[in-house]
Amino acid sequence: LRFDDSGSSDIAGGEITSLTMSLNDGWNLISGISSTIGIENIEDNWEIIIDGTLYGYNGSYVNSDNLVPGEGYWLRTNDEGEITLSGAQQSMKAVPIVPRLDQGNILKISNGIHSNTLFFGEDISEGTRASYSLPPAFPYMAFDARFTDDMKFAMDGGEIQVINTISTLNIQYEIITNAGDQKEWALTTGI
């Protein structure tokens, strides 16, 4: 709030226990209601929410299962429409929890405080690819790691963008898929 003069003011308001909001196609910035609610309390009768795309921010984007009052979240949709947040358990279609690749290779990039896990080498269906998309990066993030197409998944490799504000950068990998003689994975620097 902004006031022209110094002083104090009383501000009154009521508790928000339910909220219906209109969303655009793509990434949307949202906030919750007056109490913490789980992702299962997002009513999505229009079926526009892309599974696994609710992200909070704490210096880096993190998948979230809850909406905490006063916090902002990115949420991706596949069309415009409405969702409803409610403190009451919903009996309508709820948003599923984040999908994960069972058999894909893993690349974990960390600076000791924040980390992102990227997946590669396993094909996923066109219908679930958007679940591996990330909200827009911005220059003042403390940490971010993603493929250059704003995804945390790449089928056959790709260029990775990293934002890191400290000198430490750790990279761990786990090769799960049997590539046989057909694939060679190499991690190189663009410098």
Where are these regions (language model features)?
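N-terminal exported-region signature
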Residues: 1-191
